[in-house]
Amino acid sequence: MTFDNLTAISPIDGRYANKCPELRDVFSEYGLVKRRVLVECTWLEALCDAKEIKECKPLSAKERKALRAIASEFSVADAQRVKDIEKTTNHDVKAVEYFLKEKVKGTSLEKRGEFIHFACTSEDINNMSHALMLRDGKKVLRAAMDEMTAKIAAMAKEWAKVPMLAHTHGQPASPTTVGKELAVVTARLRRQAAEIDRLVMPAKMNGAVGNFNAHLSAYPKTDWEKLSRKVIESLGLRQNRLTTQIESHDGIAELFDAFCRWNSVLLDFDRDIWMYVSMGYFKQRTIKGEIGSSTMPHKVNPIDFENSEGNLGLANAVLGFMARKLAISRMQRDLTDSTTLRNMGVGFGYTLIAIRSTLKGLGKLELNAERLAEDLDRNWEVLAEPIQTVMRKVGMDHPYERLKELTRGRRVNAEIMRDFVKALPLPKDDKARLMKLTPSTYIGLAEKLARLA
């Protein structure tokens, strides 16, 4: 059976293939091999530039350009050649080394062939390649995350003034505005995004057990830590000086945990919007030709938010597992991280699919102002809070208890609440303010806070 979207095992490459195409260049096998080639070429270039490594002659401008082109012009056909070599070597990184030696054969770079992968352990190449994948994958996700936050912020400002009955423990609570509740989400998303932005991926280039053993055996006078740092930082990464054979993956765990927190905020938002749709606070625009149920023709379901919720759960399951697992490796290393790291794109893929599903759902939402107003008008008991607060202010006896007796577990209307206020011996200004108050106007600073989105 040939491979295409219909025969793919994973829905990321099947049903949802058009939802995250940007990640293919990053997290595919091609993406990994491409970055291995980049790391190997960058290391060779640094060795050629090191004056004390006399056997690795300096590069001419033409040679430097040719070496860099191997990495920058790396194609899917090149990646296939690496995989063909791997069939013989049964070693993925060694296959990259042999591929590069093939590429420079017959050129002036060939005489530097034995300095390809010089003094490196495979993990020197792999950890930097994975770090580059995460750096590039993070850019893709951050763009989508910012689009999400901007969309919610725009909605928050548009509906900053629209009053809404809040619900705590699923029960009517003090009113707020639609915009302010959306603004809360933007603040939460931005905080977690800032944590993601703060993280620069660590990397190592220090040999088989992290001590530069092989490096010093060949060139004992070279400052290998400095040279290693130069290569790592030239690729936008941060040097981890203290490692075993592997870079400890704590930085990856931190990044995945940060993505999990951001995802959890979005998942919480998906569920809230789902609830508001079910309560009638939002309506969903119908799209001609779409069907909500195979048997109930009237249905318009919040499927985009449900899809997002499911994919966020999958993303966090993968990223959360990886964050826990990757921090653990036996002694100087075991190979359990290798197969685990091949699934980085799965967590990123489900996250991107989820974000785009939520954005699609938000694009269909319409505010149901009439339904919001109805719910507020049915719940005048929420004004028990301001009334008892003013009663406390003027020193009246048992204000909380009196309002509790009037309102708890029962429906009250405007007439009942206003008759209660009329009978209170309150100062004129306080009484007038309470008499004017309605559930729709009892929103505190919600409108102002909404504009912080």
Indicate residue ranges for each PLM-predicted region.
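Glycine-rich cofactor/substrate-binding loops
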Residues: 1-34, 86-90, 280-282, 293-453
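A helix-coil-helix interface module used to build multimeric assemblies
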Residues: 2-215, 219-230, 292, 305-307, ...
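Generic, well-ordered alpha-helical scaffold segments in large soluble proteins
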Residues: 42-47, 99, 103, 151, ...
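Conserved catalytic cysteine-centered active-site region
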Residues: 103-109, 228, 232-249
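Short amphipathic alpha-helical segments with heptad-repeat character
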Residues: 135-142, 146, 153, 183-186, ...
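Alpha-helical coiled-coil oligomerization motifs
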Residues: 153, 157-160, 201, 274, ...
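Glycine-rich anion/phosphate-binding loop at the beta-strand->alpha-helix junction
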Residues: 192, 238, 244-330
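A structural signal for small-residue-enriched, beta-sheet-centric alpha/beta enzyme cores
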Residues: 216-219, 234, 239-246, 372-380, ...
